[in-house]
Amino acid sequence: MTVVGNPRSWSCQWLPILILLLGTGHGPGVEGVTHYKAGDPVILYVNKVGPYHNPQETYHYYQLPVCCPEKIRHKSLSLGEVLDGDRMAESLYEIRFRENVEKRILCHMQLSSAQVEQLRQAIEELYYFEFVVDDLPIRGFVGYMEESGFLPHSHKIGLWTHLDFHLEFHGDRIIFANVSVRDVKPHSLDGLRPDEFLGLTHTYSVRWSETSVERRSDRRRGDDGGFFPRTLEIHWLSIINSMVLVFLLVGFVAVILMRVLRNDLARYNLDEETTSAGSGDDFDQGDNGWKIIHTDVFRFPPYRGLLCAVLGVGAQFLALGTGIIVMALLGMFNVHRHGAINSAAILLYALTCCISGYVSSHFYRQIGGERWVWNIILTTSLFSVPFFLTWSVVNSVHWANGSTQALPATTILLLLTVWLLVGFPLTVIGGIFGKNNASPFDAPCRTKNIAREIPPQPWYKSTVIHMTVGGFLPFSAISVELYYIFATVWGREQYTLYGILFFVFAILLSVGACISIALTYFQLSGEDYRWWWRSVLSVGSTGLFIFLYSVFYYARRSNMSGAVQTVEFFGYSLLTGYVFFLMLGTISFFSSLKFIRYIYVNLKMD
């Protein structure tokens, strides 16, 4: 039976995409709010808890000795919420729309010394809980710790046994939710003997207030602790300063390079006119620089299958990154929604697999590749295999520690199904179209059978120096923005400056292209025609600088600790650097290829 001709088979292939679309929870740009009447019950879900400085080290809230129902009922979650480590469950809190609660008992508890020690350890590690009300996350600390360094030394630990919920509404919708511990004192957990029990009474209160804000997205998150709105001016000044430096650098490189190149073309073409009567074998006599290697500059490189796979996957991630930023600019990612970006990234990755297959197969056929099936397999494996290995290690560590970040088996099967039934087939389909639409490689100069000997190169034209220059300059263009992104991904902040992000992303690609052209010109001027892989490695090394920055961020800009958070941070930071290597290596290669074709087309030759 042929899959292509079977409508039912095609529907099975697109079924996971529909699941992903439904898994985002709501349509693009639509806020997931519920309409209430006065007195309607408002369900509060408990979610996860974990160290404040380790956002990816999360555990279920009911793993702590806290008030919980006799039978725990879990909320049905979307794919993005599961990937975000959410494990929502119903709680004992009774909240009704627009009905204030002065003080209500949640439960009475008798804690053993072991349970008290568990709470003490959680408070010492600054455990930070998350509840969810009407799809709005509300967060707070489990307890309070006071450390005194003066004599006599004191170390006090207390548990918050009363929570005050503040909810704002507009009409029949909840706009904002928050939790605080105002006007209460923590219950001391100190001085308990091993054979003693500690009696606790958990209480809560609810305050409702009306607001004129009509949409949740208009509610400034900076009002409850975010640092981005308060430092927006400094943020903009830093970005503008970085852009000015980048524009000066790009302008300097472009002007100098164009003047030198114009002089080279004029000199070479003049020499060609004076020696036009000479034979083809004498064409190179008296020449030097990039003209003399015109018969070798388009000589195909080794490992062409791997090169084409890098270009294909790099093009895919360029499309994926652009798509995510554009969707964010269009308001499709509400900051209050859980896992929306995760779901969108998986959906776009599966759909853009056709781009990697097309670009890789198209260029592979152009440069004379014959092992088409191997090229497709290499293209599909170039990112998926490193990602799977990294995820396996990270997920195993989470599973061993009982973290909610460990994916359930059903989610793993769903993701595997998406890749097998959507991602891989689209890669093959894109490869077929790319192979069939490929024309012969358009080389302005013929290539001789015998390769020219490359003269010794000075140290400043080595691959390492090119990688250092080509990686550092693009990295410097995004270094300021990188801090804010890291503070969002690996911290407790929220990033909403998508316009700046789009602009910086465009600057990054532009700088990478300009630097690649400059470095390729300097390489060809030294009569070194091995530019194919060099162009990929030079600017692609920006990914290495990003990984080195992640090491610096972990050591000097964050308070992350522990095996769970450390393994996840460095595992996915290494993967992020690899993705940037693929993206910028692709931009660098095609920029150099376009430049080389331009200069040799404009060179007069017999």
Swiss-Prot record:
Keywords: Autophagy, Cytoplasmic vesicle, Glycoprotein, Lysosome, Membrane, Signal, Transmembrane, Transmembrane helix
Protein name per its UniProtKB record: Transmembrane 9 superfamily member 1
Stored InterPro entries: EMP70
Entry's Gene Ontology cellular component terms: autophagosome membrane; cytoplasmic vesicle; lysosomal membrane; membrane
Residue stretches in coiled coil: none
Subcellular location: Lysosome membrane; Cytoplasmic vesicle, Autophagosome membrane
PANTHER family in alphabetical order: TRANSMEMBRANE 9 SUPERFAMILY MEMBER 1 (PTHR10766:SF177), TRANSMEMBRANE 9 SUPERFAMILY PROTEIN (PTHR10766)
Tissue-specific expression: Expressed in lung, pancreas, kidney, liver, placenta, skeletal muscle, heart and brain. The amount in skeletal muscle, heart and brain were considerably lower than in the other tissues.
Superkingdom, natural source: Eukaryota
Biological processes, Gene Ontology terms: autophagy; protein localization to membrane
Span of the signal peptide: 1-27
Function: Plays an essential role in autophagy.
Family listed: Belongs to the nonaspanin (TM9SF) (TC 9.A.2) family.
